[in-house]
Amino acid sequence: MKRLLLCIVALVFVLAACGNNSSNNKDNQSSSKDKDTLRVGTEGTYAPFTYHNKKDQLTGYDIDVIKAVAKEENLKLKFNETSWDSMFAGLDAGRFDVIANQVGVNKDREKKYKFSEPYTYSSAVLVVRENEKGITSFNDVKGKKLAQTFTSNYGQLAKDKGADITKVDGFNQSMDLLLSKRVDGTFN
């Protein structure tokens, strides 16, 4: 059972991230210098999935999973930290072989990448300052400033709801802007 679970998790990473249908990406992957090293794209700023611990070591659920997969497959790992909006561009350009970061499935990504069954489930929440009275639901964000990454599902949700988007590199930056009152909220 443990081996089956590990194989399923491996498929999540390999199919979801490496399964790009473009021939350019296949060429980039096949020209990788070290076939025993898996180049991993990740944010490194999205706890508890991918972040730095007190010793500044990259850790988190997604990092632990990809390490377990690599151990099982006798692969070395090379982690490449990048912003969310650069994640798929790095994969497409061949800078990464796989993404180990929370990735939501959407129609555009399904057209370009292959996905296995999801291994985590989450839903969007609206994050506002504790004393915020004017924003209590998703429908209240029309015309409000929300800090979002442009290419995330949450960024698309904010656009769909009519929010004024302030571009950020990740969730930590969203929270900094929210706490400093430079934005009204963020979806996450």
Language model regions located:
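C-terminal motif of bacterial Sec signal peptides marking the signal peptidase cleavage site
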Residues: 14-17
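Extracytoplasmic small-molecule ligand-binding "clamshell" domains
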Residues: 30-103
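Bacterial signal peptide processing site
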Residues: 19-22
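Acidic, polar ligand-binding/catalytic clefts
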Residues: 76-140
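Short helix-initiation/N-cap motifs at beta->coil->alpha
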Residues: 63-64, 79-90, 133, 151, ...
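Positively charged n-region of N-terminal signal peptides that target proteins for export
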Residues: 1-4, 9
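Ligand-binding cleft/hinge of the Venus flytrap
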Residues: 50-54, 66-75, 142, 151-171, ...
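Short loop->beta-strand "edge-of-pocket" segments that line small-molecule binding or catalytic clefts
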Residues: 38-42, 138-150
